Amino acid sequence: MSDLTRFTQYEHLDKVKKVVAIGGGHGLGRLMSALSFMKSRLTGIVTTTDNGGSTGRIRLNHGGIAWGDLRNCLNQIITEPSTASSLFEYRFTGQGELSGHNLGNLMLKALENMHIRPVEAIHLVRELLHVKSHIFPMSESPVHLAAVLQSGASIVGEVGIDNLTELPKSIFLVPLVKATPEAIEALQEADVILFGPGSFLTSILPPILLPEVIEALQKSHAKKIFIDNLALEQSPAASLSLSDRIQWIHHTVGKEIIDATIVPTNANDLCENLSLKVMVRPLQADDISYRHDRSLLSQAIDDLLGEL
């Protein structure tokens, strides 16, 4: 890790007992990495609806949950790279059936095939990689994301939804599965709950569609913060302003739950129509402009907690 987050003292985050981050993809992995200094006080609830890439091929041929985002989060919060972590992230090249597959995905799928609970499979890998933070799938049952289009037709599959040319009317889960019990327990015990950054429709929203998650969020007294993206999404969600996305969450949950949001300095929506705190900060990483700098992000969260 190139930043100094694990050596920095945080006035507010150091006092927080439990933080839960909800999402998927690279966004959640980046956030978990930024907060990895919190170790066992940090929990990620990860979207498991992916049907693209190596994960999609495994699901198509062998069924099961989507392991890719879980694997990515595990890999991003490793503070001490090792042969084991390199092996876990190894991706096959060349020709043939293994080409493009990630070894970590295959390892996790193998554990699933051995009838080991996904939560236990992740725990085994956490121990192998010396990861202290907790990571739970949104559900331990196979599930896909679906959408109702403006025409009234429906499509199933995260990849298809990301490739839509218009915003869907609504999204839903197929089938409507049960949430992972440990994820619900983490939400119930959380002092801070973070949403994003990441793809809004396909990474952030899926866990919030689970009835048990909705109930936990409705009852939670935790501070709830939405972290905005640094660049426009390459998906139908690009047509949604920050206010639109927060209101979509509120509509899904059935309650206005977001207390604050963190936005980059180039943000064009400061949510003036919503009753929440907005923190504007430079957040871009030096190497990749659309990725959050870990140190800047963790400091922004810490400062915002001091104002809530």
From Swiss-Prot:
GO cellular component: cytoplasm
Pfam families: CofD
SUPFAM superfamilies (UniProt xref): CofD-like
Domain of life: Bacteria
Broad class of the protein's primary localization: cytoplasm
Keywords tagged on the record: Cytoplasm
InterPro entries: CofD (IPR002882), CofD-like_dom_sf (IPR038136), Gluconeogen_factor (IPR010119)
Localization: Cytoplasm
GO molecular function (one): LPPG:FO 2-phospho-L-lactate transferase activity
One GO process term, biological-process aspect: regulation of cell shape
Known role: Required for morphogenesis under gluconeogenic growth conditions.
Record NCBIfam families: CofD_related
HAMAP family named in the record: Gluconeogen_factor (MF_00973)
Protein family: Belongs to the gluconeogenesis factor family.
Protein name: Putative gluconeogenesis factor
Organism: Pasteurella multocida (strain Pm70)
